Curated annotation (Swiss-Prot):
Record's comment on post-translational modification: The N-terminus is cleaved by the prepilin peptidase EppA, which recognizes the class III signal sequence.
Motif (QXSXEXXXL): 9-17
Domain of life, per lineage: Archaea
GO CC annotations on file: cell surface; extracellular region; membrane
Secreted among keywords: yes
Protein name stated in the entry: Probable pilin MJ0832.1
Main location: secreted
Entry keyword annotation includes DNA damage: no
Removed propeptide positions: 1-8
Domain notes: Contains an amino terminal motif QXSXEXXXL, which is part of a class III signal sequence.
Originating organism: Methanocaldococcus jannaschii (strain ATCC 43067 / DSM 2661 / JAL-1 / JCM 10045 / NBRC 100440)
Length: 142
């Protein structure tokens, strides 16, 4: 008896995997083309800035809940921009061709020292120290 082999058939799992990879490639290549490369760069810069402010706020809140004199050193990936603080509001903004302003409200007053302006995308060092029940000093290094 002859057995016929069916050639050219692929499994359903492989075909779904192949279509998923193909769709991911089309989206990855098409997004900058549809919206422009500058738009993609600005969105990624704003996303990185939001993550930097969130990480800074999280660590300030962590230090503020500890005893006086507690110090923590934090490394933060940061896009170009300027850090600022007004009482208990922490903010990061950027002017120029890509403009944004990201703020976060903390439970404790913030005193910001050091080099507050970041000129190029880099990892900055933040030394966060609790000085009393109502104030935290944040010193930025690049």
């Amino acid at each position: 008896m002859l057995k016929f082999r069916k050639r050219g058939q692929i499994s359903l799992e492989f075909s779904l995997l192949f279509l998923g990879v193909l769709l991911a490639i089309v989206i990855a290549v098409g997004y900058p083309g549809m919206f422009g490369f500058n738009k993609t760069v600005s969105i990624s810069s704003m996303s990185l800035a939001h993550a930097a402010v969130s990480k800074m706020k999280q660590n300030i809140e962590l230090v503020s809940s500890a005893d006086e004199g507690t110090m923590k050193i934090v490394y933060i990936k940061c896009p170009p921009g300027t850090w600022g603080a007004n009482n208990n509001i922490l903010y990061f903004y950027r002017d120029g061709n890509i403009k944004f302003n990201i703020t976060a409200k903390c439970d404790i007053n913030i005193i910001l020292n050091g080099n507050k302006t970041v000129s190029t995308p880099k990892i900055i060092i933040a030394n966060i120290t609790k000085i009393d029940e109502t104030h935290v000093i944040v010193t930025l290094y690049q």
